[in-house]
Amino acid sequence: MACCRCDSSPGDYSGALLILFISFVFFYITSLSPQGNTYVHHFDSSSVKTQYVGISTNGDG
């Protein structure tokens, strides 16, 4: 049981880090793109925020 609990803790961190990494990569790619980088960045930021909140709530509950 302790092992399972221990495994769950890093799992949540991994998910958050993965989302942050994906968002960073997406932002980097969009930044390289000359067309509508600001709009996409704003949309991506909002989407990531929603996903992060959803995962945070899911992991907590």
From Swiss-Prot:
What Pfam families would the database entry show? MNSV_P7B
Keywords from the named record:
Host endoplasmic reticulum, Host membrane, Membrane, Signal-anchor, Transmembrane, Transmembrane helix, Transport, Viral movement protein
The question of whether Transmembrane helix is a record keyword is answered with yes
Its localization reads:
Host endoplasmic reticulum membrane
This protein's GO cellular component annotations are: host cell endoplasmic reticulum membrane; membrane
For membrane topology, the record states: Single-pass type II membrane protein
Which InterPro entries does the record match to this protein? MNSV_P7B
Topological domain spans for side Lumenal: 34-61
GO BP of this protein: transport of virus in host, cell to cell
Q: Where do transmembrane segments lie in this chain?
A: 13-33
**Major location (coarse):** host cell
Q: What does this protein do?
A: Cell-to-cell movement function.
* The name this protein goes by in its record: Double gene block protein 2
Q: What is the lineage of its organism?
A: Viruses, Riboviria, Orthornavirae, Kitrinoviricota, Tolucaviricetes
